[in-house]
């Protein structure tokens, strides 16, 4: 099995080392194509207004001066053009990608790009607490390969990806694994801090600490809160089907 690895924290991020360890438990043919620098919050953006450079760092290992989406696109259209991967893994993100985080997540969007290319794609994220005493990626490192093994043969369907989050616990405290739906974050409560630079000019800095979420039953947010690994299938068809006929009647 040929596996392509990418992320949004950058190719030198600690979580990416964890992803490589996970991938080695699954296959001997690992390819890397990831952003050269931090790209958190890049979403599904493409670099359109300046050139992107692809740099080979070693055997089957490349960095990209662009976004996670750039990285996957370049890998599929250049490095792996004649030998497409069987699986794309994106992560392991340092931090949660739960609920509406998906909208902003470069980690999830890299997997989305893979799904658009018809390739099974999985995003992995490690939820963490700043005051935790255990090794940050312990749960992801311990559970990652086993969770992926159980998903590889699953019928993903067209334009579908899997989003996995690991709880902020030592591996021996994780309660299990749950298949759950996407939850809800209230991003309207996110903070915007206003300041002035040394020249006296105004600037704004976005923060996420004030975001609230709802622990609805059967959601990824609830699963993580209760100490479970969350596994959520996501589809790229964003159509609100129940509203489609209602709107259609207005144009008949």
From Swiss-Prot:
Disulfide bonds: none annotated. Its cofactor is a divalent metal cation. Its EC number is 3.1.3.5. It comes from the Bacteria. SUPFAM superfamilies: SurE-like (SSF64167). One of its GO terms (cellular component) is cytoplasm. It is found in: Cytoplasm. A divalent metal cation binds at residues 8-9, 40, 93. Its main location: cytoplasm. It catalyses: a ribonucleoside 5'-phosphate + H2O = a ribonucleoside + phosphate. It is an enzyme of class 3 (hydrolase). GO terms for molecular function: 3'-nucleotidase activity; 5'-nucleotidase activity; exopolyphosphatase activity; metal ion binding; nucleotide binding. Binds 1 divalent metal cation per subunit. Keywords: Cytoplasm, Hydrolase, Metal-binding, Nucleotide-binding. Belongs to the SurE nucleotidase family. Nucleotidase that shows phosphatase activity on nucleoside 5'-monophosphates. This is 5'-nucleotidase SurE. It comes from Erythrobacter litoralis (strain HTCC2594). The gene is surE.
